[in-house]
Amino acid sequence: MDRKELQVKERTVTRKSEVKKLRTNNEIPAVLYGKNIESKKLSIEKRELLDALSTAAGDNVLLDLKLDNGESYPAIFKEIQKDPIKGFFIHIDFHTIDLKETLQVSVPLNIEGEPVGVENGGIPQYQLREIEIECLPTQIPDHIEVDVSNIDLNESINVGDLPLPEGSELVTEPEETVMSVVAPETEEEPDTEEDEEGEEDVEEESEEEEEESEE
């Protein structure tokens, strides 16, 4: 489990123009909330944020928030808001945690291997890229390995088949499919008998018309 110390500052600015100025100065507005504390408006330097997100755990990294007033809180990223087009950070939500209490987190799946069913002409279909588990904050895994190399044609691997880290419990329904290998769709061949019957009917009608015209 990766753990990072993060320096943050309490902020008093709340108006849009002031918050926008923060971002111009490479500071990201944030908020900290959780059990038994009053929510705190914060700001964090962009480089500090990028450093915290640079570990293998990504946004599942365990944080030690260090406020400029000397206070310290264990926390996690609750929400990271980014501009959908330009990708810059808009706002960060931090949530304080108790290191002795379990919490529910989404953990990415690391898909490994080439399904044997693909070699046999199948098509792989991936339904899930992450699952939700419950564990202690200090036991949050960076990811969960999923070996799909033994999945054959018309077979699948479900959430309940995955190896969970010690001390964690599954939150996602075990019956949910992670990936499967399906047979390719085949095009239906036209009904040749009906086509032949149709051609015969046309020929008969043509012959009748010729006979009538001769009369």
Curated annotation (Swiss-Prot):
Pfam families named in the record: Ribosomal_L25p, Ribosomal_TL5_C
The keyword rRNA-binding belongs to this UniProt entry's keyword annotation: yes
GO biological process, one term: translation
A cellular component annotation (GO) from this entry: cytosolic large ribosomal subunit
Keywords linked to the UniProt accession: Ribonucleoprotein, Ribosomal protein, RNA-binding, rRNA-binding
Gene3D superfamilies per UniProt: Ribosomal protein L25, beta domain, Ribosomal Protein L25, Chain P
Subunit structure: Part of the 50S ribosomal subunit; part of the 5S rRNA/L5/L18/L25 subcomplex. Contacts the 5S rRNA. Binds to the 5S rRNA independently of L5 and L18.
Protein name in UniProt: Large ribosomal subunit protein bL25
Native species: Natranaerobius thermophilus (strain ATCC BAA-1301 / DSM 18059 / JW/NM-WN-LF)
Gene: rplY
